[in-house]
Amino acid sequence: MGEEERSIHNLSLPKKAIDFFESEWGIERLHPPQFEAMGPLFDQHNILLAIPTASGKSLVAYIAILNQLLNHNPGSRAVYIVPLKALASEKFEELKEIGQHLGLKIGLGIGDATSEAKNIDDSDILICTSEKLDSLMRSRSE
């Protein structure tokens, strides 16, 4: 697979998403493992991506989320689950930047505060810990 083939311009995402990744994050092409994941993702398959730390798993997840929200299920919502509050905050900042460029609302659920409720309810993409997701599901099923 050549570098040209791995260009982000070959992704089936709206131009504004491609432009964001290129101009704001300096991403011009995907790494080989990221590129290999794109076929199944854009064909609506679930994948398990096991690659080293800092090799681009989050970008693959962001592209998968954007593909669903912008291409296949406009008006739907996504949940990005992480194990730690610190990681949730980090991903929130990244996704908030994407959301500002693409008109998506990003929510963060990591605490017990009722002030989070509106943020959670209004978000297109919710980033939360597994514990918070469990709490949300239990409290809303009652």
Range-by-range predicted roles:
Residues M1-N10:
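Interdomain "pre-motor" coupling segment immediately N-terminal to P-loop NTPase/helicase cores
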Residues P14:
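Pyridoxal 5′-phosphate
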